[in-house]
């Protein structure tokens, strides 16, 4: 027998396959930008099938990422959020193929600002838990349409 090989699996990406703190540092971030911001009155709807009913006058930001890019449709309708300028921005309405909408009513932001889908402020494990799945699925769902940028220390 030979014992000189290791299968790193998801550990290569800084995520423990067993959960918990394994002193691994996650290495991946999925980001986009705010494409547009619109003020939308209360009782209006947002997204496919008009599922996102707004309870109050809201500022809604459109993000150029959708389920064709790997953003899971089940995150829509406030079941998940992204991070904008350090604040949680809930997804409103259904996640569309190429775009999604988030509520930025209480967030100071503007078009062009960076949006973290997952990364240092929102872990892949957290997103996976919202979806009742495993981190592998969240990471491998990211489409080849998404530009990859690699950094070296």
What do the PLM-derived regions correspond to, one by one?
Residues 1-153:
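Active-site anion/phosphate-binding pocket segments in diverse small-molecule metabolic enzymes
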């Amino acid at each position: 027998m030979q014992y000189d090989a290791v299968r790193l699996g998801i550990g290569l990406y800084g995520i423990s396959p067993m959960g918990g703190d394994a002193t691994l540092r996650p290495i991946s971030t999925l980001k986009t930008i705010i494409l547009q911001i619109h003020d939308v009155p209360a009782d209006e709807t947002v997204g496919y099938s008009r599922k996102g009913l707004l309870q109050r006058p809201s500022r809604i930001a459109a993000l150029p990422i959708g389920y064709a890019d790997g953003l899971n449709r089940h995150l829509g309708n406030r079941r998940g959020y992204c991070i904008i300028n350090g604040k949680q921005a809930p997804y409103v309405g259904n996640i569309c193929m190429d775009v999604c909408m988030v509520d930025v009513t209480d967030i100071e932001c503007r078009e062009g600002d960076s949006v973290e889908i997952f990364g240092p402020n929102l872990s892949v494990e957290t997103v996976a838990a919202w979806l009742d799945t495993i981190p592998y699925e969240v990471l491998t769902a990211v489409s080849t349409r998404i530009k990859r940028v690699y950094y070296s220390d």
